[in-house]
């Protein structure tokens, strides 16, 4: 068995369309959100192969500098990072993506300080993940605030709760 084949077997064990608790730490702020495990989320950073979870930008707005949220809402594709705030340069990525009925475009993504997913009685610390910042609401009824990439639940460090 190759590692890729074993991971594909593990993916089939995950219950999709399940709501999980997601804890995110970013810029000395901690958020706790409901996340939907979505098999349709196959978004990766093409350079690092890091999985990308999706979140509405308003959920993180209080953690982000105003210049960044303005650029995300205006769909700026070339980041303009102020010199006095250059620490954000190492946390930002632009991820190419396609959605149904939409031409190819870019999604702003940010590298969080830490992410933890509570799934089936275990806490999973996800070290390799990006948060894609979407400008469209994800859930019409507010049931979840982020879309969890299934790869976040595989090959990660499990912490017994």
UniProtKB/Swiss-Prot annotation:
Task: Identify the Pfam families for this entry.
Answer: Peptidase_U4 (PF03419)
Its Gene Ontology molecular function terms? aspartic-type endopeptidase activity
Q: What class of enzyme is it?
A: hydrolase
Q: Which domain of life is it from?
A: Bacteria
Output the InterPro entries linked to this UniProt entry: SpoIIGA (IPR005081)
What keywords would UniProt list here? Aspartyl protease, Hydrolase, Protease, Sporulation
GO BP, one annotated term: sporulation resulting in formation of a cellular spore
Q: What is its EC number?
A: 3.4.23.-
Active-site feature positions = 38
Similarity comment: Belongs to the peptidase U4 family.
What does the record give as the function of this protein?
Probably activates the RNA polymerase sigma-35 factor at the stage II of sporulation.
Q: What is the recorded name of this protein? A: Putative sporulation sigma factor-processing peptidase
Species name for this entry?
Answer: Bacillus thuringiensis subsp. kurstaki
């Amino acid at each position: 068995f190759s590692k890729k084949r074993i991971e594909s077997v593990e993916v089939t064990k995950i219950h999709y369309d399940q709501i999980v608790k997601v804890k995110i730490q970013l810029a000395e702020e901690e958020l706790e959100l409901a996340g939907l495990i979505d098999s349709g989320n196959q978004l990766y950073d093409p350079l690092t192969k890091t999985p990308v979870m999706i979140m509405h930008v308003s959920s993180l707005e209080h953690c982000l500098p105003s210049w960044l949220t303005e650029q995300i809402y205006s769909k700026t594709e070339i980041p303009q990072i102020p010199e006095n705030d250059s620490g954000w340069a190492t946390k930002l990525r632009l991820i190419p993506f396609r959605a149904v009925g939409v031409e190819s475009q870019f999604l702003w993504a940010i590298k969080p300080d830490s992410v933890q997913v509570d799934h089936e009685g275990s806490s999973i610390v996800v070290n390799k993940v990006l948060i894609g910042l979407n400008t469209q609401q994800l859930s019409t009824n507010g049931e979840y605030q982020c879309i969890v990439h299934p790869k976040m639940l595989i090959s990660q460090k499990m912490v017994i709760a």
